[in-house]
Structures are given as C-alpha cells and as structure tokens.
Regions:
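Ribosome-associated RNA-binding proteins
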Residues: 1-143
Length: 143
C-alpha cells in the first residue's frame, strides 16, 4: 500500500485507510436494543472510526430508547465523523451504508439523524438475527 503524507509529514488516520482521496463508502452499524442505541461507523476494511451510544449523548435510562434519542445519536455520530474528516487532512467519505440490528421503530430515526448531518445514505440493510426454529424459548411467566 502506498502511503500518502500530509503537509506536516504525518499520515492521517483516514488516508491510511484509503479514504482520503477516493471518497469511499463507510459502513454504519446500528444496534438497537430495548434499553440503549449503539451506532458505530467503520471504514471499508472494518476499522472503527466513530462510536457513540445514546447514553454517551447524555440520555438517562428510560430516555435512551426514544425516537428523539435515536435521532440525536445519529446526528452526534455524523457530526463527529465530519469533524474527523475536517481535521484528518481533508479526507472525504463518499456515502454511508447502514446495517441495522434490532427494534424497527427506532431505525428510521437514526437514519434521519445521519442524513441531517449531511451524509448520503447509499443503502439500508437489516441484519437482525432471526431464529429458524432453533432453541426452544423459555416457558411463559405466570403472574
């Protein structure tokens, strides 16, 4: 791999990943659980660039699973990536491919937050694990 150097002689983190001049597509992994939201942006080779949760965006326990928290988390991740691109020697991310796992009601809010940060969404994929009649579920709770 040929190294690209910045003016100061240092190699930027994004240029090492091959994203400086090409404007490649970054991958966004959104994990939506019942109690929290985790959004991770990775380079095409899998290196983590930015990671944020609803808890790190100052949402308390019950607020973390709301649509507002999902949109704010998506916006926070997008603005952090923009800041990384600006300080990383003019690196450009061409677009985002979103992989979601979990609750469907919060999915649109996270994508809306990423889009409002100014990124082009190139694809949305659902990777929620679905059992094909695997393990037997626990018996129902009696109250």
């Amino acid at each position: 791999m040929r190294k690209r150097y910045m003016e100061s002689g240092k190699v930027s983190a994004l240029s090492r990943l091959g994203m400086r001049s090409k404007g490649l597509t970054a991958k966004v992994y959104v994990n939506l659980t019942m109690h929290n939201i985790v959004v991770t942006i990775t380079a095409p080779n899998g290196d983590v660039l930015v990671k944020k949760t609803a808890g790190s965006c100052d949402f308390s326990s019950t607020q973390r699973s709301t649509k507002y928290a999902a949109q704010a988390t998506g916006l926070a991740v997008g603005t952090r990536l923009k800041e990384l691109m600006r300080t990383g020697g003019g690196a450009q991310v061409g677009g985002l491919v979103v992989y979601t796992k979990g609750i469907a009601k919060l999915r649109d809010a996270v994508i809306r937050g990423l889009a409002s940060a100014g990124f082009r969404i190139e694809g949305i994929f659902d990777i929620t694990p679905v059992p094909h009649n695997g393990c037997r579920p626990p018996k129902r709770r009696r109250t």
